[in-house]
Amino acid sequence: MEAVPRMPMIWLDLKEAGDFHFQPAVKKFVLKNYGENPEAYNEELKKLELLRQNAVRVPRDFEGCSVLRKYLGQLHYLQSRVPMGSGQEAAVPVTWTEIFSGKSVAHEDIKYEQACILYNLGALHSMLGAMDKRVSEEGMKVSCTHFQCAAGAFAYLREHFPQAYSVDMSRQILTLNVNLMLGQAQECLLEKSMLDNRKSFLVARISAQVVDYYKEACRALENPDTASLLGRIQKDWKKLVQMKIYYFAAVAHLHMGKQAEEQQKFGERVAYFQSALDKLNEAIKLAKGQPDTVQDALRFTMDVIGGKYNSAKKDNDFIYHEAVPALDTLQPVKGAPLVKPLPVNPTDPAVTGPDIFAKLVPMAAHEASSLYSEEKAKLLREMMAKIEDKNEVLDQFMDSMQLDPETVDNLDAYSHIPPQLMEKCAALSVRPDTVRNLVQSMQVLSGVFTDVEASLKDIRDLLEEDELLEQKFQEAVGQAGAISITSKAELAEVRREWAKYMEVHEKASFTNSELHRAMNLHVGNLRLLSGPLDQVRAALPTPALSPEDKAVLQNLKRILAKVQEMRDQRVSLEQQLRELIQKDDITASLVTTDHSEMKKLFEEQLKKYDQLKVYLEQNLAAQDRVLCALTEANVQYAAVRRVLSDLDQKWNSTLQTLVASYEAYEDLMKKSQEGRDFYADLESKVAALLERTQSTCQAREAARQQLLDRELKKKPPPRPTAPKPLLPRREESEAVEAGDPPEELRSLPPDMVAGPRLPDTFLGSATPLHFPPSPFPSSTGPGPHYLSGPLPPGTYSGPTQLIQPRAPGPHAMPVAPGPALYPAPAYTPELGLVPRSSPQHGVVSSPYVGVGPAPPVAGLPSAPPPQFSGPELAMAVRPATTTVDSIQAPIPSHTAPRPNPTPAPPPPCFPVPPPQPLPTPYTYPAGAKQPIPAQHHFSSGIPAGFPAPRIGPQPQPHPQPHPSQAFGPQPPQQPLPLQHPHLFPPQAPGLLPPQSPYPYAPQPGVLGQPPPPLHTQLYPGPAQDPLPAHSGALPFPSPGPPQPPHPPLAYGPAPSTRPMGPQAAPLTIRGPSSAGQSTPSPHLVPSPAPSPGPGPVPPRPPAAEPPPCLRRGAAAADLLSSSPESQHGGTQSPGGGQPLLQPTKVDAAEGRRPQALRLIERDPYEHPERLRQLQQELEAFRGQLGDVGALDTVWRELQDAQEHDARGRSIAIARCYSLKNRHQDVMPYDSNRVVLRSGKDDYINASCVEGLSPYCPPLVATQAPLPGTAADFWLMVHEQKVSVIVMLVSEAEMEKQKVARYFPTERGQPMVHGALSLALSSVRSTETHVERVLSLQFRDQSLKRSLVHLHFPTWPELGLPDSPSNLLRFIQEVHAHYLHQRPLHTPIIVHCSSGVGRTGAFALLYAAVQEVEAGNGIPELPQLVRRMRQQRKHMLQEKLHLRFCYEAVVRHVEQVLQRHGVPPPCKPLASASISQKNHLPQDSQDLVLGGDVPISSIQATIAKLSIRPPGGLESPVASLPGPAEPPGLPPASLPESTPIPSSSPPPLSSPLPEAPQPKEEPPVPEAPSSGPPSSSLELLASLTPEAFSLDSSLRGKQRMSKHNFLQAHNGQGLRATRPSDDPLSLLDPLWTLNKT
């Protein structure tokens, strides 16, 4: 039925308009009632007249409907201002023609005009609805709408204009028109439903409703009054309507029959089809004389219904045989009205347009507007009262809490150095000699001070001596021999001058001491400020909050943010309410509203504020809940608040102290200069006085001698008597003996400097002064001295007692007093030789060892050891200094000493109470720097009779820094390892001498001095199983704060030509880590002895003055010349001295290197809570990714931030080299660009990108090299010591020559760029990238460096990679290669074509992946992007890249979760299997052949590489440093097969007890490696004690063990045939001596 031809529709004619002269009446009313000039409204009246002309001659289209509606609205506006209704003041006659009769009808009422316009509006809509053919869906909809609008217009006219102005607008005619229009609209809807094949039952109901509407219209047409009014058209309409009633009834029953057929009610189906056929036949009868369209529709329908009826009847007759019910018994079809009259709103502004008479506002409208304003004000006052009450409560609550959201969580402020301190550090960094200048100035001042004091003492001594001589003279001669008055007066004048100068000196001495105290107070801080920034940062206090405390803090922050959010929302809502009320003006509505409906209008208008009121009330109600939560959070925050408050005080105090030290520097320098000037003047005066005193005293002595001679001639010769020996004052001898203090001690006040004292005669049990003090305080003996100076290296004719430098002991600590039974000491004096020294040969002294007290054995009574006093033995010194060509340092030489005298045996011990449990070190803390003599070669005269002590690590009492000391606390002392183990093997079962954490660091002024001899007790050991002792580089505490470590120097003992005992292998002791404290290296060989118990961590050392050093390159250029014989046990030159390694100077740039990459020690996701947290973060992160608007906002914020940041950074240098920039808008900032040190100019378009993550290496982001900048690129690779280059350029770009090939592509075809030549070593292609190993050689140097070039070719220039998985896999490959290099702070070079787009995305993803792998969760990507862009503009150039990075992070986190057994939330992507291969590319610094590396780096690297791989571990993580061995490992837990590195075999001539044989362990299978076949790293890794072998397959050779070394073998030594497979077999061990 959807194709049935359309039935014709009924439409109405338009009424014709007559005259309406409204202008004169309106003008008259405006003049009279409004008091305005009516001519001012001529324009408005003309507009209204023009609008009426258009309305009465309306076009027959949709535009005509708009004109009619607009005119209707303007008439409504005019009526509300000028009363023109029936009987009103401004009424004028209105004339229109009546349709049916054609007569003109006039009324003096503007409402008649409005009614006629409404009628024409309905008629025009009926015309437009009937004109459409309704063959399309759109046509059916338009016709349906027009008929509904027509029905609306007629219905509005019928209801709002009750007076029948004319016959065609009578109520009966309007009702007829409404029903006709609704029926035709429903008919259009029926046609649309049949076209859409709606359900049969629904179509039947729609059709039945059409029948209902037409029946209503038919009843109106049959009304006699209506029939008489309509005239001729009544018959035509009635026939058409009746025919349609039967027709649509037939259609309704047809679809009811279809419904029965669907329900398989075949009898009902026949009944409905029968009824439809009957009604259709009735319609055909009534259709006679109708147009062809009606006939066509009836015929079509007859075909459909007839066919359906015949088919149904046959089916029922022959198949179903159901009874056919009567139609009356079937359910009647109820109509479904789906159309309605569309209402007319005459004052709709969208239809009427602007009010033409808007300027005319009646007074009544103003009054109503004021009433409405009062209603609005009442509403506002009510809401503001509630808001103010709540705000007052909130303010009082927050004031009482004293919680400022800005300062509650200022933990970030403690993580970096504050700006004011950074300014001070920067000011000191450009003045590196600040501390040195201050110390030197104070040293000069101290020197002059000491000279003045010495001169004054000399004057005093001369005067006292003169007085003594005068007394003797008087005794001998009497008053008769008085000296001249002039001489006495002159002497008195000298005394007065001396007293005056002494008084001035004493006053200045106090000032000088204060100045030194101030200097000592500030110099440490100044050293700290001028040192590395990480040390400054470490000196500032840091918050120590537990995770629970941080959670409390975060909770409080969250609630405070809620409070602020609530406040902001409240202010915003209040502002919205005020603005809405202020803008709300309904005057125009009031003008057109009747006075009786004002109240109703107010209520409707005030409803618009209901939504805002609801929001405000919800906000106010939430305040109580938020404050309750804030109270609970504040209670939990109390403890954290106290911690943060204390931290803030400490932070501010430390900050003020450091700033005050900086500000005091200039004042100290000024005062120091004033002191120097003062003392220089005083010195000259005192020197003059000293000369005068000497001359005066000499003159007096001469005079006395003359008188004495004269008197002696008179007297008989006396009996010979011996005069009383003079006892010189101790201070005098000290002043003579002390000499100049060392350089570091000259800056100390004079009252703190004392020379070594001569011993008094032994009295009872007093401790002789020439013995070192006891390690623990005693009630007897002298108190500890803070400092003592060593003997100056001059020639002394000393006393017979042995003078030994005092070493300061620890600060005095109380010891429980008790009775002690001490025997009297015994000693054997012996006349000593006078040692001599020369500038090249220091005094080779051998102070008696063992003079200190032996440590008490736990549980045994202790007594002081036997004191031994004797002369210091001096060695005969060779007059020559031997030098070797390859060693640029003098080699001191000397001969062996005489045997030491045999000390007395220990006296018997008596029980004494044990001291307090405060163990002290057996070695003496070195308070001042001692002159370091050369190595000793003792002869075989060994004293006997001393038991060997049990030496173990002794805890050091924690020292407290003294205000007047210029040095920090001493590091804990360790027992000294044996220097000559063949003389005195110590008795130490189960213990080996531990190694100190501090290496010996050379001090200024003692360059090139070897370390002091390692003295141990000269005790022969009892017959136990001794472990072979070891000797090595001994760490010595320096006299100041511990110095930052220079590269540790390996000192081995110089063996004599004929060894007397076991030779000690050199032992390299690693220095502390760069963080300033001793950190154990990961995976080291277990220590030979347990480490001492943990003590307090020493304060961070200030940076020391660097001694004059060799350049780094000079040391590295001749690495193997550093005495390989001394390190590998080869023979030495006859000079016998050990060559000294000069410390290498690190460049300033190298000093600023970032800290090494932080390694991921273990899997952070072993804990389930970490996994759960990661899952939650992933869900939140997915939400961000799914929100396109949020990503757009983030991108806009990043762009704005970049513009803001770029304004504060300069690119002036880059602009000068425009030819070296690929794009003129991509240039590096001046502050962090890479500077070329050895090129023609220092510019390259490359930026250092650091600080993205502690687990991500530093990166150098650069553009792809241009043809003219490839040499600069490789020069940067060489200078930065880069080992890994990442290239993110597609093959298409290289084929189109957008990017030049700057690397060799064929083996055997090297490429030269400037001074560098490149060669391709190997190429390997994988499914994600191309890996090239290149070798880089600089000019004519023979050394080559290897580096890895990783090319990711599947990232197009203007797109994205194929999948995030490939890029993630590539990043893991890059990181794996990076971890194989050493050291771990060299950067990775990353470039695409421009160096910002793909490079930025790679860097961002690299950092994010490392953060996730380290267990830190998903980082804030926008923060990382901004951090990158602060270092290089335009990093991450496209928003597409940002979205890709978000997706890649999601993919990586899913992989991490899958790795730990957490299934993905949706269908996972293709799992990118991470190929974990042990790639071992050649290291950038060839550690075996040397390269540009100091020997310390080689040693440190070998130590780092000494890792035993666990069995069966195949992932690359096995090669990473892991957690260190626990420090307290007992010796029993050492692997028995691990050889102790420091042990040495006993000599062949010295039989020793056999060591137990080590148990053989099964060999550990090596993890398979797919890296290159050999590299320097592999070789170095094989040099560790665990893994050393000359061939990886062992080739069937016997494994060497300790037992092999203990057995004697007859061989040719160095002339033995070397195995051909030894990679070092071709090295000549004597090559340094054969070079010439």
Swiss-Prot record:
GO cellular component assignments: centriolar satellite; ciliary basal body; cytoplasm; cytosol; early endosome; endosome; extracellular exosome; intracellular membrane-bounded organelle
Impact after mutating H894Y: In NEDBASS; uncertain significance
Composition-biased stretches (Polar residues): 1120-1131
Biased composition (Basic and acidic residues): 701-714
PTM sites of type Phosphoserine: S733, S1122, S1123
Start-end of each Sequence repeat: 953-954, 955-956, 957-958, 959-960, 961-962, 963-964
Coiled coil region boundaries: 550-623
EC number of the protein: 3.1.3.48
Chain's role: Plays a role in sorting of endocytic ubiquitinated cargos into multivesicular bodies (MVBs) via its interaction with the ESCRT-I complex (endosomal sorting complex required for transport I), and possibly also other ESCRT complexes. May act as a negative regulator of Ras-mediated mitogenic activity. Plays a role in ciliogenesis.
Protein name, UniProt field: Tyrosine-protein phosphatase non-receptor type 23
Gene name of the encoded protein: PTPN23
